[in-house]
């Protein structure tokens, strides 16, 4: 189980496919995941767009507003590509989470491996906690980024 029972989370989904059913299915899956692990879902948002741009990312902006206003303690996504496929954008979002002391929780990937594969592990360090069930899942408190 995750280490953050009864903590406030925001769920974010991005879907490049124009079929809204895919985004809603992903959103409902994450809501079920959050409920099953005792998270308190304080908000959800999603975008139908490419993961390589910030254009038309109203859902991402809404999530970041919740983070910056202290309304959540964690952001729940399937994987890092939900945030962005562009490393520059991803690092910027991770920095905002870090500055606000917000956890990033992924449900469909090994976050540590994903950060290493994307070359971003040097930006976020190695403070990962393995969940105790199913396939490897991680939640991470992002440490200071010393350089870009």
How would you describe each model-predicted region?
Residues 1-148:
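Short, structured surface patches at the beginning of a domain
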